From Swiss-Prot:
Present with 300 molecules/cell in log phase SD medium. It comes from the Eukaryota. One of its GO terms (cellular component) is nucleus. The keyword tRNA-binding does not apply. The lineage of its organism: Eukaryota, Fungi, Dikarya, Ascomycota, Saccharomycotina. The keyword Cytoplasm applies. It comes from Saccharomyces cerevisiae (strain ATCC 204508 / S288c). Residues 101-114 have a biased composition (Low complexity). This is Uncharacterized protein YER084W. It is found in: Cytoplasm; Nucleus.
C-alpha cells in the first residue's frame, strides 16, 4: 500500500510569485522596483539545491498496523492527549414517556390534554 503525502500546495510558488509581483511594497515607495524581490525569489528557486521537495512523496507502507501513528497526522484518541472527556459529560438521563402521552399517541382520535384555556403567566415586574 502506498501513501501519498502532499508536502505543500501545488500553487504555492506561483501564488508567491504573483503576490510579490503585484503587491506594492515599502521598497517601491523608496525608489526600488517592486518586482526586484520577486525576481530574486524566483532565481533562488531555480537553483536545483534550493528547490523545494517534490509535490508528492511516496512512502511505502507494507503493514500499516505495525507502524506507530505519525505526529504529523494524528488519528484516534491520541490526537490530543490533553483533551479528556469525563464520563459525566457523556451521560444523559434516559428518556421516559408519560402514560398520558403514550395513551394519546396510540389512539387515532385527537385527545385534548386539558379542557381549560391556557393563559401565559406574566410576572408583575414586566407589566407596564
Amino acid at each position: 500500500m502506498e501513501e501519498l503525502i502532499c508536502t505543500y500546495p501545488y500553487h504555492s510558488n506561483l501564488f508567491m510569485f504573483l503576490f510579490l509581483f503585484f503587491c506594492p511594497s515599502k521598497r517601491a515607495r523608496r525608489g526600488h522596483p517592486k518586482f526586484l524581490f520577486t525576481l530574486c525569489y524566483k532565481s533562488n528557486h531555480l537553483i536545483p539545491k534550493l528547490l523545494p521537495p517534490s509535490l508528492f512523496t511516496k512512502r511505502v507502507m507494507l503493514n500499516p498496523s505495525s507502524h506507530p501513528p505519525s505526529p504529523d497526522f494524528p488519528t484516534g484518541s491520541s490526537a490530543s492527549p490533553r483533551v479528556k472527556l469525563r464520563p459525566s459529560t457523556l451521560w444523559a438521563p434516559p428518556l421516559t414517556v408519560s402514560s398520558d402521552f403514550a395513551a394519546s399517541s396510540s389512539s387515532t382520535a385527537p385527545v385534548t390534554v386539558t379542557d381549560k384555556p391556557v393563559t401565559p403567566a406574566v410576572s408583575k415586574r414586566y407589566q407596564p
